[in-house]
Amino acid sequence: MKTKTDFLKMKEQGEPITMLTAYDYPSAKLAEEAEVDMILVGDSLGMVVLGYDSTVPVTVEDMIHHTKAVRRGAKETFIVTDMPFMSYHVSPQDTMVNARRIVQESGAHALKVEGAGEVISTIHYLTSAGIPVVAHLGLTPQSVGVLGGYKVQGKDAESAKKLIEDAKRCEEAGAIALVLECVPMQLAKFISKQLTIPTIGIGAGQKVDGQVLVYHDLISYGVNRVPKFVKQYTSVQEEIVRGISQYVTEVKTGQFPEEKHSFTMKEEECLALYGGKQ
């Protein structure tokens, strides 16, 4: 299993880091078989798995439950778990309780937190206690209400400068990596060169140290639309609907199940049961 030391070496050597979300045993198992470097159990599970309109309703219990399943499916892959909405915007003591629960009960190797500001002290607090933390800047889904929706961040010089400073502060606070979401590629490139820790982009262009996508977006599974920055590599949704539709048709028309899908009794047992008559 790769560790944070390996990820630092990958950045130094210019080897791109691959990260993918996973929310359950089968998706994690497939991600590991495909040799993904790092798995993110994102609070995006609220939308793509639980059917919420945003990540806000996701709880600590949700994150623990799903991360445990992911760990069972990907025992040899570094796993990062999101701290959900408001689980780290509380007192330092309560933040530590939530963080400890996620790590101890789920088996996550690192936690991810969004934003800067007061979150910088949280990063320092958690890393000082021995909990690896991945920072997340740019578009931070837990704060879309404050940001005015799902919009690209850092498009003007002033906001870009703030993101640069925030990125440096995240590294200084002890973050082991930084996710940059929906920021101009020029800005992402500049930030990546300023930091010694890896940057993982999602909608941040090519010149970052790695990429992350949502599992369901990548394979077109249960999603009606995807953001501009997503490339869909296959469409399992079409195959799934086709298969289920065929099943429904065959049950309705009596084509399924066939005899080969059924179990039988020996003739003498049938005679003993009902005299051979049906």
Curated annotation (Swiss-Prot):
Reactions mediated catalytically: 3-methyl-2-oxobutanoate + (6R)-5,10-methylene-5,6,7,8-tetrahydrofolate + H2O = 2-dehydropantoate + (6S)-5,6,7,8-tetrahydrofolate
Chain segments annotated as transmembrane: none
Pathway(s) served: Cofactor biosynthesis; (R)-pantothenate biosynthesis; (R)-pantoate from 3-methyl-2-oxobutanoate: step 1/2
Compartment annotation: Cytoplasm
Keywords: Cytoplasm, Magnesium, Metal-binding, Pantothenate biosynthesis, Transferase
Cellular-component GO terms for this entry: cytoplasm
UniProt binding sites for 3-methyl-2-oxobutanoate: 43-44, 82, 112
EC number(s) per entry: 2.1.2.11
Keyword match Cell wall biogenesis/degradation: no
Cross-referenced Pfam families: Pantoate_transf
Record: active site: 181
HAMAP family (alphabetical): PanB (MF_00156)
Protein family membership: Belongs to the PanB family.
Protein name: 3-methyl-2-oxobutanoate hydroxymethyltransferase
